[in-house]
Amino acid sequence: MKFNSGALFEKLRGGAGEGNTLNIALYVGLAIFIVLALANFLLSATTANKAQENITRASEMRVISQQIAKNALEAAAGNADAFELLDKSQKGFQSAWNAVKDEQVSDPEAMARLQTLWDEVNANADVILKGEDTVLDLHEVADTLAQTIPSLQAEYEGVVEILVTTDAAPEQIAFAQRQSWLAERIVRSIAKVLEGGDGAVIAADSFGRDASLFGRIMNGMIEGDAAMGIDQVNDPDALDYLAEIADLFDEFVNQSVDEILETAPELFQVRNAADTIFRRSQDLLEESTNLNNQFENTTSGLFPSVWLGGVSAGLAVLFFFIIMAQRNRQAAKLKDELESENQRNQAAILRLLDELGDLADGDLTVQATVTEDFTGAIADSINYSIDQLRNLVQTINNSAVQVASAAQETQSTAMHLAEASEHQAQEIAGASAAVNEMAVSIDQVSANAAESAAVAERAVAIANKGAEVVQATIHGMDTIREQIQETSKRIKRLGESSQEIGDIVSLINDIADQTNILALNAAIQASMAGEAGRGFAVVADEVQRLAERSAAATKQIETLVKTIQTDTNEAVISMEATTAEVVKGARLAQDAGVALEEIESVSKTLADLIQNISNAARQQAASAGHISNTMNVIQEITSQTSAGTTATARSIGNLAEMAQDMRNSVAGFRLPEHS
């Protein structure tokens, strides 16, 4: 059979051209899918990392929003450390907000609302930080006054004791007692000023007026003040007490009045700013939570991209096997055509096969010899195919290495994200436990406050009963005073009656003297009459003896009357002194009633304050419970994120194994060292 080398050569060229076109298309598709897979995996990893950072920032904003509210209230209450914590929290929130405010979210209006809320909270935080020196100085002054006022009260108690002991005027005793009440009112007014609220302005005005009145009364007791009706204290010991009181008042109280009144408006601004932050912190927490949820929803769109990358990698592997199958089909077709063409080509083919024997073992370093016979075209085509196969194997090796490297990096990143998510879940669990403990503590505070409120209410009832007892005592002392006055009047009338008896006794004494004189004259006349006047002399002697006995009796009566008058005068003086003491006791009892009314008022105020503390503690406990539930939800979401990241890492690990399998599939081919 004659061999047509020209026809065979043209057929081979046509078949090779068609195969090259198909191979190029397959190579292009393989390269496209490999690049697409790598780009998709890198983009997914970058996007996931950015989304996780946004979620972390939003979570930080949620926590810091509550820290700002807590630190603002503590700073306004005079806690020096709270100002530093507030400044740190403010900067932390601003930093987190700057990092996420330009991110794209599904609800842009939420970002605008959050910006508005933060601007308001940030401005009020600046007000608090600006007033740090004023608040701390004012609380320091208040603490100094709180330590000084008890000393003033103790000194005035000494003054009152001395005045009572020395029987001073009741008005002086009342003024001295009033000073202790004024000192107590000054302390309460300062406390109300520091607490802020609606009554703070009134408390500041009351503080100024009470401090001024305290100073005027103090100076009046030392020097006297006719306008206020205060007499100067003369007792040296009492004056020593008053001098010490004046030194304390001038050193601590008087110098602090103007400072407190001048800085009180700025303190009110700080308190209002803290209250505003506390009210808006819940809205800030809700908007931060909304932002966190939007960022978490954004991460859910990453997983289709990951699967798209896996599909692209699978298609790349499929294209590789299609190329190999195409090559095998071309080789088989060429072999069939050669065998069917002519058996005479067997020798040339065997020679060519001998040269290419190592190619069957995967040795791509062989090179077929191109001769002038018909095997030359075959050798040339085989050499071309070997070159293409070399390029293909080299491309597969390089692509597999790149895919494996990218998969390892992506897997490392995913595992790092999984570890970070697990660590975040642990931290959230710890925070949730701490919040639960805080809720238990707040419940205990609420229970203690409720019990204190009950005790304060009992104190109010006791003070009320004490006031009633004092009123009854005053009424009884008034009755005693009236009875003593009535008795004094009767004793005075008895003295006047005894005076009249004395006058009558004097008259009787005069009559007795005159009778005695008449009897003496009668006796003289009887003796002059001689025997005829003897009987008349006996009568005259008897009359004289009766007159002498009457005179002696009248002297005894006169002595008794004088004794009665003396006792009556002493009784009148004693009754008047008793009446004065009763009046003084009534005034002291009335002052005690006023003091009990003050105690009742203070106890009511204390009960209201304790009730407010209890209500606030219950509200804080409810907020802490809500935070704990929220933290549990965050922990569950973080656990799900960690599980998803771990699953992604396993999928990427499978991709790396597929790349290794692809390298193993071409490991049997031997390439030239220079390539």
From Swiss-Prot:
Pinpoint the HAMP domain residues: 343-394
**Residue ranges occupied by any Methyl-accepting transducer domain in the UniProt entry:** 399-635
> Where does this protein act, in terms of pathway?
Hydrocarbon metabolism; alkane degradation
Instruction: Supply one GO BP term.
Output: chemotaxis
Q: Which residues cross the membrane?
A: 24-44, 303-323
Question: What this chain does, per the record?
Answer: Chemotactic-signal transducers respond to changes in the concentration of attractants and repellents in the environment, transduce a signal from the outside to the inside of the cell, and facilitate sensory adaptation through the variation of the level of methylation.
* Protein's name according to its UniProt entry: Putative methyl-accepting chemotaxis AlkN
**Organism listed in the record:** Alcanivorax borkumensis (strain ATCC 700651 / DSM 11573 / NCIMB 13689 / SK2)
